[in-house]
Amino acid sequence: DVEEGEFFGLLGPNGAGKTTLISCLGGLTTPTGGRILVRGIDTRTDRRAASLVLGIVPQEITFDPFLTVRETLRFQSGYWGILRNDDWIDEILANLGLTDKADASMRALSGGMKRRVLVAQALVHKPPVIVLDEPTAGVDVELREHLWDFIGRLHREGRTVILTTHYLE
């Protein structure tokens, strides 16, 4: 069990099932047994409601190369039915060091910048549970510290954070 407001780490080697568990949480993979409840919501029987309380940062970097960073976040917001949240988007961009990249094309960003956008996408709907699958893979030390500071702040504000990693640092 992961308690509400907890910072929980899934530590294990490659192939241990960390990403598979996250895929089950997000409804991308159907568990072969048991149940997964997120804030009391069954991820199997009520995927939409469960997804509304989850912000998942995937391990793989995926993006629409034809959108800017801001357009990407607005599009993601629309997916959640949120049409006007530019103030929150601006706050996310500032906290992730992306303000100066807001109008840049996604295809023009470095890998580390794209990873920051993945984090921003997971946060646009202000989910109470944040799941990060190897969020600092391939990013520099400065970004890593900046990201942890921001995630730490969100945790102190009451969000539950679940993190997967290979290493203790």
Spans of model-derived segments:
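Conserved ABC ATPase "signature" region
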Residues: 74, 78-101
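Conserved catalytic motifs of ABC-family nucleotide-binding domains
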Residues: 126
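Helix-to-loop junction immediately C-terminal to a conserved catalytic motif
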Residues: 26
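Catalytic Walker B motif of ABC-type/P-loop ATPase nucleotide-binding domains
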Residues: 130-133
